[in-house]
Each structure stands twice: as C-alpha cells, then as structure tokens.
Amino acid sequence: MQDHKQRFLFPDSDIRGELVQLESSISRIIEGQNYPLPVQGLIGEAVAAVALLASTLKFKGRLALQAQGKGPVSLLLAECSHDGELRALARHSDGQDWSHGDIQTLIGEGTMVITITPDQGRQYQGIVPLSGDTLAQCLQGYFQQSEQLPTRLWLASGNNRAAGLLLQRLPNQLSTTDGNTQMWEHLEALASTLQMEELLNLDDQTILRRLFHDTPPQLPDAQPLRFGCTCSRERNRNALISLGNQELQQLLEEDGEVTLTCDFCRHQEHFDAVDLAEMLRESR
C-alpha cells in the first residue's frame, strides 16, 4: 500500500471528505525509537490527523499538531507539509504501565496546539484543552472552537499502520441550509458505521464504496504521502551558533567536537574542532 490521501466530494452538496492511509511513513517514524505500543498508536493517529488537516492548506507551508500534558507522554508532535511530507515524535517517561492507550491516560490534563506555518506570511495557532477521550474527539473540539465548521474524524493505528477519515460540512454554496443539514446527518450516520479494522485494512475505494454506495462521491486524484524531515547541517550549525560565545567556547575547550542527532529522523551531524572554532568566530 502506497501512503496517500484521497479527497472525496458529494455532488450538489457542501460536504467534503478526506481518507488517509499510511504504512511506510509510520514504519519510518517509529523505527529505532523504542516507543511502547500505546505510544506508537498515539503517534500513528497524530500523523494521520495532520495529513487530514493539512488538506485545508491553500499555500506552501506546514501544519503541526502538538499535545502536552502531565501524563507519561509529556509531548506528542506531528507535522505535515503542503506537499505531503510527514514526521512525528513523542517524549515519554520510562518504567510506566503501558496497558492503557487512551489519550487521557497517556498525556493526561493538558493542551493541544494546531500551528499553521506558511513559507511566506504570518503563523497561525489554535489552542484547545485535551478534553476528549480520544485524539479524534479533541480535534473535533478544535474545529468546533477554532474553525466553527461541523467536522467528524475517525482515526485508527496499529501494526505499523495508521489511517484516518474526515468528514466536514462547508459553508453553504451548492445547496440550501436544509439540504446540507439533511445530507450531513445522512453522511455522518453512514460514516459512523465504519469499523477501525476496516479503516486500517481495506483500500480506500472499498471503504468509500461500502460507506456511501447510495451517494457515490467524486474522487479527484489521490495525493501521495511520505516521510520527510526538514533537518539539515545548516540548521544544526545555526542552532549551535545560537548557543552563544560562552557555550561554544566551552564545547571547544572541553570536548573539541559535538554530534547532534535529529529527534525526528535520528540523522546525525558531526562538528569537529575546526567547525566549532569557525562558528565561534562567526558568533563574536
């Protein structure tokens, strides 16, 4: 299965949908990280979620979901770019009982931040409390508070796979309020019959045909999705320079070298004494 996102539209109504199915990018995100299984599941749901939400981007940029709380998972971060590059990470404590995988147990009391960062222009942030029992419920609260658009999400993750379904009612343009309300209630009821095992294991065409066989949606071309990281030697170099003269001098004198590891992709960049001395000169 190639990782992809499939948009679907219902003729003569102001309702749209997105279906995301991921495998290789999830495997790449979690490999070598030693995440407990419930944390892997939470990461998978978050990655599927940002892939769905990034469909709202009308410009070049990135969308990020960040959740922080007082539970054993102190940080959950997932990002998707306008062209379908995905990455994610989680920070968690050790020695925990990982038998429960709901968001309230894993992250606990906290907040979720959705950040939209255009390549050009001003950044936008929406902040909501982690008040739902699932990540999907928390995101539905975000849409209700920040976007004020009726939105339903279904997220599933397991066995190095993740998938998501989004259904959203847009402002009236193609139909009347009554017509859109009736169609929304009908489609929402149909989508609610979806089982998480079906979302994870069936192909998108089969899922959409089973759910909406009486109102077949239009299917534009699917968008491929893939793992991708924005780390680079230049960014790591700039991060070291930003430490300032004193810390750079200390690194040079005590260690003579430094290796930085990207938290997302585990790529390492090594800087030797010559590199550090050059950075020290630049920072003065």
UniProtKB/Swiss-Prot annotation:
It is found in: Cytoplasm. Its main location: cytoplasm. One of its GO terms (biological process) is protein refolding. Coiled coil: none annotated. Keywords: Chaperone, Cytoplasm, Disulfide bond, Redox-active center, Zinc. Disulfide bonds join C229-C231, C262-C265. Under oxidizing conditions two disulfide bonds are formed involving the reactive cysteines. Under reducing conditions zinc is bound to the reactive cysteines and the protein is inactive. GO terms for cellular component: cytoplasm. One of its GO terms (molecular function) is protein folding chaperone. Redox regulated molecular chaperone. Protects both thermally unfolding and oxidatively damaged proteins from irreversible aggregation. Plays an important role in the bacterial defense system toward oxidative stress. PANTHER family: 33 KDA CHAPERONIN. Belongs to the HSP33 family. This is 33 kDa chaperonin. It comes from Alcanivorax borkumensis (strain ATCC 700651 / DSM 11573 / NCIMB 13689 / SK2).
